[in-house]
Structure formats: structure tokens, C-alpha cells
Amino acid sequence: MRLDRRELAGALADIGVLVPIAVALIVGNGLSATAVLLPAGLLYLTAAAVYRLPVPVQPLKAFGAIAIAKGLGSDEIAAGALLMGVIFIVLGRLGLLDLAARGFPRALIRGVQLTVGLLFLKIAWGLVTDPPKSFSEHALSADWALPLALVTLVLAFALRDYPITLALVAVGAIVTVVLAGGEAAFGPSALALPSLDTATIVTAFTVLVVPQVPLSFANSCLATADAAKVYFGDQGSRVRPGRLATTFGSANLFAGAVSGMPVCHGAGGLTAHYAFGARTGGAPLAMGGLLLALAIGLGTSLAELLTAFPLPILAGVLATAGVLHILLLRDLRGARAWAFALFVGVVGFELNLTVALGIGLALWWGAEGLRRLPRLRPAA
């Protein structure tokens, strides 16, 4: 484990997903800023200790998007986090995810990673062309934001072997302070236990958990474990699907208990950390420490500060990670593998990842079964 400029630069590389969802949950859904960042910070520290590699922490993307779009309150979000925690701890501890992973061909996992890469690009585009409402006060028009995001993307891509994200985040922090103005209030925001009843739990399960479980299974567990092996070889064997499920499941039990932001791991985040220099557990250690410091030290004023962070910087870094994540497909060999990966990736992006994986698995193993059938031989 090390903590040098490269590790610190890599640690900051995945903020393009974290910041917009966190801000929307704080501003739009009324979650405590401290409760939003605490689970993410603690899971980063856990990842540093357990995996000793730059395993990422992200908000639950489908879960968060639905909660934001529907304006759900902290109780429904907390109930969903608790349910996600229970489901994935059980799946992880029973070894079911490690067993299921053996049935997923590499081509289909690459398809999942293609879906995630495309989603990163879509989110980045939306940040500058249709900014989230919570950022509207300080957002630039698309005429300015889009060129600035493209410049950020080019710089981030070309200089990713240097600590470019440190420079970009430093610029963003200066702009944030200037735009937010005034003096920051120090101290954590209040934490609250959720108030749960049957109706709240049923709503959380049907509206939030059911759409999220397949994505977390495919991306947070299978695709993240695969990406770790690609980037870190034998060291990546510590990053198993079942272990990933257990660590982020445990974090969600805590998130639910404090009415905070549900979190997971993610293959795209691993690419982001790795691409910008992270190679050890030092990156998640640094990021976890930063998030805890912000949650405890600036929780009362964090929402106002984060809404002023420049969206072109978030979009440019996120788009770079998306492009690099799509490049994982380079190791595919043969037309069949490419066809399956592209099918899962495009259908998962345009329609539904669960549907894409279901059809992909059925076609893959159906074809395998036909290939293994004994050929009929003419009678002698």
C-alpha cells in the first residue's frame, strides 16, 4: 500500500458518478449530507483493508436515479438500502455469486462492461447538456460547458499517466469556493434513524430494489471481479464476486440504519481509479478518509458547496473513464465473442441489462449445447 501522487490522483478519478447522485439525494430527497457520505467513506476504507487494491465505491445507480426521479423520502431509501444489504450479504456468504460467475462467459461480462462504459458517456453528456436541477444555480450553458468538458476529456485522457486529476479537482475546488461564496459552516449534519412500516418496505422493494439487483449482480460483482483480474492479474483474485457482495452489502446495512446513501462497487469505477494511477489500497484509503472528513467536518454546508462544483470537470473525467472502460473489449477474440459482447452491451444500454443478459446467456449456452450434441452417424 502506498500514498503517492499517483495514488491520490487515482483516488479522485471516480467522482463523476459520486458527486451528482450524492448532491441530488441531499438537495432533492432531503438526505443528510453526513449520512450520504459516511457509508461511501467507510466502504472505501473497508475496500482498502480487505482488497488492498483500488476497489471503487459508487452510489447504486439505478436505485439512485429512480429515487431522485420519483422524489422518494429518506425512509424508502433507507428501507431499500437495508434490503440490498440483506440480499447481497446472503448471496455473498452462501457462495452463490461465486458459483454463478462460473456460468458467465467472458464475452457477456465484456458486454456488461460495454453497457457501463456507454452509461458513463451518457451521464457525462447529460451533465453538460441538461444539468441536474440541483446544479442549476451555477451550471454553465451547453455552449460553454460542452467545449470545456471536451477540453477536460482530452487533458485527462492524454495526461492520465500524470496526476492530472489532482490538478483538475484543485481547479474545481477553487471555482467551488468562489461560486459558493460566504463562510462554510463546520460540523456534521444530523443523522436520523429511519421510520419503517410494511408499506415503506414494499415500496422500497418493488420500486428501488428489484430494478437494482440485476445491475449490482452483473456490474458490482461479476464485472468488477473480472476487471480486477484484467488490471492486476493474480492480485486481483482477492476481488471475488461473493466477497464484493459481502462488503457492499454490509455498507448498505449501515447506510439504511442512518438513512444514508446506498452504495456498491463498480467495474467502471475500478477502471477510473486504475487509469489515473491507482495501483494499491492507498487510493481507497485516501478517498475514504476524504469522504469521512467532508461528512464530519463540512456536513452542514456540503450541499451548497457541492452544487457549485464545475460540471465540465466531472463530465470530462467521467467520459474518460467511460472510454477506457469500453476498451476492455480489446481482449475479445473471434466474431462470436464480439457479437455477444456487442449484443449485451447495446441492448443493456438501450433497453435493459437484465433482458440482455438473460437472452445472451440463453443463446450462448444453447449454442454450446448444440455444439456438444453427438453427431448422428449413418448406420453401418
Which stretches of residues belong to each language-model region?
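Intrinsically disordered, low-complexity non-transmembrane regions of multi-pass membrane transporters
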Residues: 1-8, 183-195, 229, 233-237, ...
